[in-house]
């Protein structure tokens, strides 16, 4: 949904619940 999760995912994973990796940043669903 919302574009920003406040997390980067250079390693390929997001640790914030409800977020997915759109490299290199995490995006919310």
Swiss-Prot record:
Probably participates in a plant defense mechanism. It comes from Oldenlandia affinis. The keyword Disulfide bond applies. GO terms for biological process: defense response. The presence of a 'disulfide through disulfide knot' structurally defines this protein as a knottin. This is Kalata-B15. Disulfide bonds join 5-19, 9-21, 14-26. Keywords: Disulfide bond, Knottin, Plant defense. There is a cross-link at residues 1-29 (Cyclopeptide (Gly-Asp)). This is a cyclic peptide.
């Amino acid at each position: 949904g919302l574009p920003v999760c406040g997390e980067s995912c250079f390693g390929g994973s997001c640790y914030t619940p409800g977020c997915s990796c759109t490299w290199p940043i995490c995006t919310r669903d």
